[in-house]
């Protein structure tokens, strides 16, 4: 049975030796020959140094080594690649992850240096004589379906990254395995592989600096962090294939190290101003009337709602690119969208990759174009998800973009479709409910009631919705009711591999690598890549195609796309929500380390968790705390699942109060957020940051994953436990100011207990040395907000100075015709304003300047004074 699922092409074209063996003796490693060194590069041949061990496949006899010094001081990057001599082994396609160019470094002058031992081959990367990476811990193994490499680490290292996971920000250092294999992972459990693949880690060494190590490899892998029996610390890669394609990068600070990573995987995409507003969604809104009622209720409660979302409920029998004709009929949907747009609000729906294989145009179009995944016998590959039996788009197919554009243009037409403003893509790991080998998806769908039965049809809305069209009112009102292994140099994978049951078993929480996903023996169209190698790319390729389709609809507008599955570099296309979390306090807490890791270390800065939790029933207290914490994510969305307690912010008085207060702060800060986010899209400098990014020599910050910096200026210290009204917040050796009172807090590198924190309140402190431009007040929509004047909050540092910046543009255009970039400096009691003042600053004024930590003197009659603040009304034009 198994044999029929394998690729059994001969191995004649590959430089391999023997077959799988039970030999448990150490593998021989490789020896170096034919070394050629240049000013900025090194190449060499590697040949097997002895008898093959064939532990989890066949040892490859001949390899190549490439070393490139890609950049110069102070921010340096070293590229080290070990690959097969014939270049048959799969490599991540450049069409998915474009390669960074560079041989600008010079080996004699580089702080990063590569050295090697000839036999058995090992290599070391050093930074100014400090060892960063040392593979002498074990011999290199490079087999047809297994790669192994181990590096020594310093004692008790501070390691971060290797996402996606819900473990601590600082990774455990003993008996810890990070499995990277994207999967549908409801409840986002700890110690488990989740939705995304980010094989990059950061090693922070305090005063000596920070460096990162990125392995550009999309195969499934286990990365182990542990100690040997004699206590030596190591990190070990165990991958199911691909090549060792390493990038070592460093900066003078942790922040600059993250910036260097952005040069490798790509800068994040800039988002529209409105995308930073509040978003509301739920799986289980029964019809368009209920969606409209939620919009109305937010307005009635005085809680600003920027964007309304609809989950899979809007579809006809859960089929993508369809509408339920009775519960979400097109005329009503168009009225809903028109209403939102007239009120300066936005609308987003969800699209899954899986297309129903039963009676729908998207399926017929895809079959006609041949763009769905196929079995090796040419038949369509089928799985089972929400609509029942499904097929899956092949993102490698040369015509896939044309197909995706066409479906988007028709269904989301502004003229006669659902005119969405953004997009949510889900289930794109890809998810498959059917257990491998899923021999009969049709029967599985029947046995599991897929698609599920929809709710009963309501002929009209049961309650009046003032301001909505007549068709949204109760019936009593005036209304009308209604392919195989590659050749030499192809880089698509060796022939003859077992693509569904590899000898080495990664610790995939779902079991078999084909379980609950697309079968890994599928061969993609085009170049002939195997799903075995490209599985972790599926979601990111959908992201890229979806961005293309949204730009095809509106070429001049930045598309907001939020995805579940990601790979390294996904931030250049999309934002990410953290998946199907639970309404639990531990998941509220762990979301902090998740958003910080994605934004600062993985360069996916548009990120947030489902506020109040997706699965299970939230509580009033948890939701109130989460409404406040979520206001300090970059992506701020309330979302929960069908059958759970309704958790829109207006459902409880305390939650509504918490949300109003938090959104007021967020909206005042929105241009500060927008400015810092824009900077990350230009330079890679992170917006959301762990504490050690700003205090890299303070060891007390290294493992702190319950506080974070919102930009450089704002420290967020949420209450962490149920029933508590206090939090032990750490303050580094610096000056901070209470956001609410302006009171100075002199940090001394110790924790301070903040007490009497109301459930509607979140502790915030402004870091000294910063100037924050804020809007004079909040607003119900971001469009209204943009008409508000500015105030400047000046928080003098220990030296009495402060600085800040403000970026302004039209908020939406992909290419800007006029921008303003303004710098503020405060020294010796004087404020200077400099910069480029484009037309985006027209009509924008600063109406007041607030200096924190100051008290008025009798001669300062022009200032309004509180105990710890001085505010000077004024008018500064930013034109």
Curated annotation (Swiss-Prot):
Q: What is its EC number?
A: 3.2.1.20, 3.2.1.21
**EC class (word):** hydrolase
Question: GO MF annotations for this entry?
Answer: alpha-1,4-glucosidase activity; beta-glucosidase activity; carbohydrate binding
Please tell me whether the keyword Hydrolase is annotated for this protein.
Answer: yes
One GO biological-process annotation of the entry reads:
cell wall organization
- Compartments where found: Secreted
Return the annotated region ranges for Disordered: 446-494
- Any idea which UniProt keywords this protein has? Carbohydrate metabolism, Cell wall biogenesis/degradation, Glycoprotein, Glycosidase, Hydrolase, Polysaccharide degradation, Secreted, Signal
Catalytic residues in the record: 426, 429, 580
Could you confirm whether the keyword DNA-binding appears in this record? no
Q: Which Pfam families match?
A: Gal_mutarotas_2 (PF13802), Glyco_hydro_31_2nd (PF01055), Glyco_hydro_31_3rd (PF21365)
* Compositional bias (Pro residues): 451-467
Q: Name one GO cellular component term.
A: extracellular region
What InterPro entries has UniProt attached to this entry? Gal_mutarotase_sf_dom (IPR011013), Glyco_hydro_31_AS (IPR030458), Glyco_hydro_31_C (IPR048395), Glyco_hydro_31_N_dom (IPR025887), Glyco_hydro_31_TIM (IPR000322), Glyco_hydro_b (IPR013780), Glycoside_hydrolase_SF (IPR017853)
Instruction: Provide the reaction this enzyme catalyses.
Output: Hydrolysis of terminal, non-reducing (1->4)-linked alpha-D-glucose residues with release of alpha-D-glucose; Hydrolysis of terminal, non-reducing beta-D-glucosyl residues with release of beta-D-glucose
Q: Which residues are glycosylated?
A: 22, 175, 297, 377, 515, 581, 617, 787
What is the documented function of this protein? Glucosidase involved in the degradation of cellulosic biomass. Has both alpha- and beta-glucosidase activity.
Q: Which family does it belong to?
A: Belongs to the glycosyl hydrolase 31 family.
Q: What is this protein called?
A: Probable alpha/beta-glucosidase agdC
Organism expressing this protein natively: Aspergillus terreus (strain NIH 2624 / FGSC A1156)
Q: Which gene encodes it?
A: agdC
